[in-house]
Amino acid sequence: MRTLALLICLPVLAQGANPAQSLILEAKATLDSRIQAYRAHVAAGKPRADFKWDFTLQLQRINDQLAKPQPETVKHALLVAELGYRVVGRQRLEPATFEAIRASVPAASPAWAIDPALLTELAENLSDEKTAASYLAQARVQSPVAEVRAYLLEQQFEDALEAKDEATWKAALAALETQHAASKDLATARQSLEQYRKTAVGIPAPAFKLASLENPKAEFSLESFKGKWLLIDFWATWCSYCRLELPFMHQAWDRFQDKNFEILSLSFDQKPEDIAPFRRTPATPMPWKHAFVTGAKQSPLAQAYGIVGIPKPILVDPTGKIVATDGELKGKRLVVTLEKFLGK
């Protein structure tokens, strides 16, 4: 989840703020502070799992306030703040929780300025896709907060780019350019487009050389897979979206491992030792080839492949040409795409 940074003008905005605005600003500041602390923790080389997310006091205060009658705008701010603390705090939430918030907090509520990414988090956890899409569309158009509208346009751009929906991503980019020219979201969208083109379908895959994770004396390179179909999988054990893809990858491996097909998972974990314990879990053996990418997203390999986020799957044909990427290789579409090239 991408969380917005604090506005430089925060102290000015706080002056004379109404109760709902004050709650929004306070929650925004608290979440940003903890996220920055987490990033510093990771940058220092400390294990991600050792970081303590603790919003106990904030959640207790919110519960106390929600137990009393509140103006609707204050209630909206409290509910979104509560969602933010629980999501960022890595609490497991049931779908009913997201449904209840959708029913209680309008899509265009200013409270979503606490962190616009909570809107996409909510939408991803709603059971009905049409309801989720409608809720996001309403917020994207009607939110009174410019940064919320810009964020949602950028997310629409990213989703359409991954889905190769050219008409939609071009429209979203144009809206960012005309309506939010000075926003960081426009800069992010332009950067994503530039990086995306590095692995466009039809071009040769960038060359690489990496030591095998299981046998450091062995080396993987694009040349070593020549003549085979290769699914390159940029991932990490800490990446929840990567973990969600693993059942589909195991299914694909079982189906196609005997059809001149290889998978090479390239880890962005903090250290190589993080991977073996994860693979010892019965549900995630990942019985294919593995390598560790030193430097992760900042590595030359990540730059060559234009990695903006993970998971990032890329299918390379036996000649070394990229034939499919991103959404074509995720979820149930992975097997469908592989059947297209390798047969059923």
Question: Language-model features: where?
Answer:
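Helix-turn-helix repeat elements of alpha-solenoid scaffolds
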Residues: A49-I62, V88-A100, E124-Y135, D165-W169
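Short solvent-exposed coil/turn linkers within tandem alpha-helical repeat scaffolds
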Residues: A67-L78, Y85-P95, S104-L118, N125-K130, ...
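N-proximal helix/coil linker or "cap" segments that precede and/or mark the start of modular domains
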Residues: L152, E162-P216, E223-K226, P277-R280
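Conserved redox-active cysteine motifs that mediate thiol-disulfide chemistry
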Residues: K226, F234-Q251
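Structural microenvironment flanking redox-active thiols in thiol-disulfide oxidoreductases
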Residues: L244-T284, T294-Q303, V336-T337
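Thiol/disulfide oxidoreductase modules built on the thioredoxin-like
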Residues: T284-M286, V293-E339
